[in-house]
């Protein structure tokens, strides 16, 4: 169920219990450095699936962007680039990434031979610095829950959006990994992940960042795994543990064997003996409205905002 958010609680500086130093280090880790190898880098399956579901929501949005930007495309899901190109064939796509080399790798990976049909269905893509008011849609899939400073990231998305442009984003919510958290708690281990922000608080932060008409939605997706090894491999592909009180050092093979044994207790008959993990996925959509001048004895407005207001006034009927 989707609904419009109108809350007044103060936003958080960052997701609860998140270590910003670790999150920032992970976000900017250069492509090609361990554990990233260009020949093997792919987007996590869950990220691709969430991107596919979020793309379907674009059918309910009447605005037709002339340009869009995909933020951190490897984590956002590489398949979405073709889907956005198909939905908005006349629009120019842009790529932005925090990690050095990511945009270049994505562009190289999508080059097809001239005789392959896929070549003719690739969207137009550019990789260049993003100017203020330069794009009509920001696409940010599965990013915010791992942002070291989410309010700064929201502000950056607001900056690059043109007036009446819109933001589409998704991230993980509080019920994510609840089965794994319970297992760790039973063992008196530090938590396996930081606490994820509630969708209502994301709505607050959107308004605080200057967005209008935020609409939030959520769903829970259950993934099952044949073995502890497969479960841990999938989790590693999605990110790292950024909890401030996570294990402080490396652990040996004995602990890993213990972890595997403990994870086997998560197997349930209703999942045919497979290990089940819950992922709460939060979806958000918001517009960038006309800037409003505060009524005061003296008011200030940025030059870029003034230009946009004058441009809108000239084009109004």
Sequence positions of predicted segments:
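Class I SAM-dependent methyltransferase Rossmann-like catalytic core
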Residues: 10-64
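Short glycine-enriched loops at secondary-structure junctions
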Residues: 99-101, 144, 171-175
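A short SAM/SAH-binding and catalytic strip from SAM-dependent methyltransferases
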Residues: 136-151
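A short glycine-rich, Lys/Arg-flanked "PGG" loop and its adjoining helix->strand segment in the class I
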Residues: 151-163
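Conserved catalytic/acceptor-binding region of the Class I
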Residues: 168-230, 237-251
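C-terminal lobe and adjacent flexible extensions of AdoMet/dcAdoMet transferase-like proteins
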Residues: 229-317
């Amino acid at each position: 169920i989707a609904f419009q958010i109108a809350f007044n609680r103060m936003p958080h500086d960052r997701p609860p219990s998140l270590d910003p130093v670790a999150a920032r280090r992970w976000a900017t880790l250069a492509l090609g450095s361990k554990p990233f190898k260009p020949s093997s880098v792919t987007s996590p399956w869950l990220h691709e699936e969430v991107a596919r579901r979020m793309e379907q929501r674009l059918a309910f949005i009447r605005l037709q962007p002339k340009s869009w930007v995909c933020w951190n495309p490897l984590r956002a899901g590489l398949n979405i680039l073709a889907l956005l190109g198909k939905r908005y064939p006349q629009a120019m796509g842009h790529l932005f990434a925090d990690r050095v080399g990511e945009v270049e790798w994505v562009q190289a990976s999508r080059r097809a031979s001239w005789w392959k049909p896929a070549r003719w269905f690739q969207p137009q893509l550019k990789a260049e610095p993003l100017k203020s008011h330069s794009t009509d849609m920001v696409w940010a899939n599965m990013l915010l829950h791992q942002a070291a400073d989410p309010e700064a990231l929201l502000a950056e998305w607001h900056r690059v959006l043109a007036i009446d442009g819109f933001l589409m984003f998704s991230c993980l919510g509080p019920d994510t990994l609840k089965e794994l958290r319970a297992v760790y708690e039973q063992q008196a281990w530090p938590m396996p992940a930081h606490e994820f922000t509630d969708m209502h608080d994301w709505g607050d932060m959107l308004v605080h960042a200057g967005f209008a008409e935020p609409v939030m939605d959520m769903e829970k997706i259950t993934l099952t795994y044949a073995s502890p090894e497969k479960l841990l491999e999938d989790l590693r592909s999605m990110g790292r543990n950024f909890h401030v009180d996570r294990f402080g050092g490396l652990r040996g093979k004995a602990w890993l064997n213990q972890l595997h044994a403990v994870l086997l207790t998560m197997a349930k008959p209703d999942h045919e003996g497979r290990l089940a993990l819950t992922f709460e996925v939060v979806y958000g959509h918001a517009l960038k409205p006309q800037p409003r001048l505060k009524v005061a004895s003296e008011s200030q407005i940025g030059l870029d905002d003034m230009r946009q207001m004058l441009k809108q006034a000239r084009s109004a009927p």
